Amino acid sequence: VLILSLGCENNQPDQFEKLLGDYDKSRIKFLVVQKVQGDEVEEGMKILHSLYDIASKDVRTECPLSKLRIGLKCGGSDGLSGITANPLVGEFSDFIVAQGGTSILTEVPEMFGAETILMNRCQNEDLFNQTVKLVNDFKEYFLSHGEPVGENPSPGNKAGGISTLEDKALGCTQKCGRAPVSGVLGYGDRLKTTGLNPVSYTHLTLPTNRE
């Protein structure tokens, strides 16, 4: 991994590095652009080539599906994705969870209108309350910035046949299949349990789809 920094951000590389703990310095490199004396791109390419040389010596090893963690994100919703591609992704998610693996559902704003489907699948009352808070906190975030909650569908979504946020939400929740909710992740949380885990963010680390 090559971690790029301009050099003047609030999140400084030396502080960020402390959060990584004990890590393999041969596989994780930092490049601070403002400290490069010559060509930044050339310097970056040198580092990437060194990382490639290390990675090229790696050998694949078998591991059980219980070690697999998958992330479910936006796929560009249209009028058919909720009955075609998304249910197929859901079947795959269910298969991974059934083998002891982990599935992480993102896109909280795209769940608005179908969130009760997830709430009804929570394994216990505590998870139910966490899921309710997950959704309501995002709604409050929208409202606190003067943004309407129901205008998530983009022009591209509408051109493809999506008419309301509820249409999109029913498709979004298909991506996680029928597995019970076994954990709820807040922003920045680490996984604590296998199974299906909705996460309090979108696109795995990016703003929700407005394109």
Range-by-range predicted roles:
Residues 211:
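Acidic, glycine-enriched catalytic cores built around paired aspartates
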Residues 188, 193-201:
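Non-transmembrane, aqueous-exposed alpha-helical and coiled segments at domain scale
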Residues 2-184:
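Buried, small/hydrophobic-residue-enriched core segments of structured protein domains
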